[in-house]
């Protein structure tokens, strides 16, 4: 499945996304169900790359986030089908407000994909018994890990080292 995702990915999409992410200080994630797990992992990685990130599990909060998001925020959607009605409502609102939209999906011809500025297509399988959602999550995590690695190339190593030192001095577990 990961080989399939790797073959589907277009390097120019990563460059387009990197350009959008480099211009912003804040990434708002929009996802539902198991995709929220990927959004949370990506958000914690992006924070390490100096990108403030927001993830809300409740759809009400995602709607509110979209209504108040400054246009400088980049919206990052994770949707296997690209046809979730609630995510579509949010994406349409963000598009009207002028926000850039990134999308990870298994459906590059979906309605949500048509609203996105950058689309990452990942593998899935059609039948639930073939673990379709799990295959999708694996590919989605792969994409967010690559984006994190790209963002980290833009971070000053000394800054990262200072953060690490501060954390080790002030947080003892």
Regions found by a protein language model. Give the residues of each.
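A short, well-structured juxtamembrane/interface segment
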Residues: 6-23
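Helix-enriched interaction subdomains in cytosolic or periplasmic regions
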Residues: 1-3
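A short, charged, Gly/Pro-tolerant segment at domain boundaries
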Residues: 157-173
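Residue-level recognition of alpha-helical structural elements
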Residues: 10-13, 95, 159-160
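Glycine-rich phosphate-binding loops that contact phosphosugars or nucleotide phosphates
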Residues: 22-142, 146-156
């Amino acid at each position: 499945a990961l080989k399939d995702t790797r073959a589907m990915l277009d390097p120019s999409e990563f460059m387009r996304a990197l350009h959008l992410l480099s211009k912003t200080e804040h990434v708002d994630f929009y996802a539902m169900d198991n995709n929220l797990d990927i959004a949370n992992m990506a958000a914690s990685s992006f924070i390490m790359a100096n990108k403030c990130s927001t993830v809300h599990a409740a759809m009400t909060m995602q709607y509110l986030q979209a209504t108040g998001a400054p246009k400088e925020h980049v919206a990052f959607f994770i949707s296997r089908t690209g046809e979730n009605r609630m995510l579509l409502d949010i994406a349409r609102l963000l598009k009207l407000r002028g926000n850039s939209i990134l999308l990870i999906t298994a459906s590059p011809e979906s309605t949500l994909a048509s609203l996105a500025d950058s689309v990452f297509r990942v593998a899935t399988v059609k039948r639930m018994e073939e673990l379709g959602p799990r295959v999708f999550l694996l590919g989605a995590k792969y994409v967010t890990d690559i984006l994190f690695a790209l963002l980290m190339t833009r971070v000053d190593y000394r800054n990262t080292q200072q953060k690490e030192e501060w954390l080790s001095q002030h947080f003892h577990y």
